[in-house]
UniProtKB/Swiss-Prot annotation:
This is Complement C1q tumor necrosis factor-related protein 7. Residues 36-134 are annotated as: Disordered. Residues 38-139 form the Collagen-like domain. Residues 1-16 form the signal peptide. It comes from the Eukaryota. It is found in: Secreted. The lineage of its organism: Eukaryota, Metazoa, Chordata, Craniata, Vertebrata. PANTHER family: COMPLEMENT C1Q TUMOR NECROSIS FACTOR-RELATED PROTEIN 7 (PTHR15427:SF24), EMILIN ELASTIN MICROFIBRIL INTERFACE-LOCATED PROTEIN ELASTIN MICROFIBRIL INTERFACER (PTHR15427). Residues 143-279 form the C1q domain. It comes from Homo sapiens (Human). Pfam families: C1q, Collagen. One of its GO terms (molecular function) is identical protein binding. Residues 63-76, 93-102 have a biased composition (Basic and acidic residues). Keywords: Collagen, Secreted, Signal.
Length: 289
């Protein structure tokens, strides 16, 4: 393509060249012959800056750039306006019990409620002061009768020393306060009691005593004379409930107690004379209640 243009330019320019073999005269007018263009020269130095052109039209917005790095935390701003109340959320899990709050103000007095059920009995109170003497009471001396009496014998001879003698033959036992298995009388009612014994002896001396809670109250000694004899004793004792009374041999080898049910008996007896009046009063008060 470039060669074709070059040949065409050359033909055009050749037709316009002046003829050199023609003589120059007075009426000479030159005819130019177009030359062939040379190779491009080197670029010239940059020209001076022109004056700024008018502002162009605003271009279209560019695409959003990538997010920058997170900046440092700024200072706390001022509180904004309170927003509207949002919808009620779901119930959360039950939290730990908080500390007891301060006592609130006393509320208005409520209406009187109904009478509640009777509560359990309270503890026994302290003893009050003694009151004034009351009116004379009604005699109930014959309404309460407490009985305690016994009479027992023995069917064996020569018992062991310093042990309760077992009187195993029961003749009378009001209230069952004498125990024929142990030989002991056990007090049931506080009061004054009368005790007695009549012991037949033979072949040995006899040293016998009446014992109250481990202490001798009376002692009786009877010597063997070669014949049957009887040793006796009696006394009055104040007893408390659970006190014990029995007979025993108090000296070694002097246990001449003799028993022959078909011929002679050895007896141990006792009975209540009267009950302690304070005890009777307490029983009377319980009956009234």
């Amino acid at each position: 393509m470039f060669v074709l243009l070059y040949v065409t330019s050359f033909a055009i320019c050749a037709s316009g060249q002046p003829r050199g073999n023609q003589l120059k005269g007075e009426n000479y007018s030159p005819r130019y012959i177009c030359s062939i263009p040379g190779l491009p020269g080197p670029p010239g130095p940059p020209g001076a800056n022109g004056s700024p052109g008018p502002h162009g039209r605003i271009g279209l917005p560019g695409r959003d750039g990538r997010d920058g790095r997170k900046g440092e935390k700024g200072e706390k701003g001022t509180a904004g306006l309170r927003g509207k109340t949002g919808p009620l959320g779901l119930a959360g899990e039950k939290g730990d019990q908080g500390e007891t709050g301060k006592k609130g103000p006393i509320g208005p007095e409520g209406e009187k409620g109904e009478v509640g059920p009777i509560g359990p009995p309270g503890p026994k109170g302290d003893r009050g002061e003694q009151g004034d003497p009351g009116l004379p009471g009604v005699c109930r001396c014959g309404s309460i009768v407490l009985k305690s009496a016994f009479s027992v014998g023995i069917t064996t001879s020569y018992p062991e020393e310093r042990l309760p003698i077992i009187f195993n033959k029961v003749l009378f036992n009001e209230g069952e306060h004498y125990n024929p298995a142990t030989g002991k009388f056990i007090c049931a009612f506080p009061g004054i009691y009368y005790f007695s014994y009549d012991i037949t002896l033979a072949n040995k001396h006899l040293a016998i005593g009446l014992v109250h809670n481990g202490q001798y109250r009376i002692k009786t000694f009877d010597a063997n004379t070669g014949n049957h004899d009887v040793a006796s004793g009696s006394t009055v004792i104040y007893l408390q409930p659970e006190d014990e009374v029995w007979l025993e041999i108090f000296f070694t080898d002097q246990n001449g107690l003799f028993s022959d049910p078909g011929w002679a008996d050895s007896l141990f007896s006792g009975f209540l004379l009267y009950v302690d009046t304070d005890y009777l009063d307490s029983i009377s008060e319980d009956d009234e209640l």
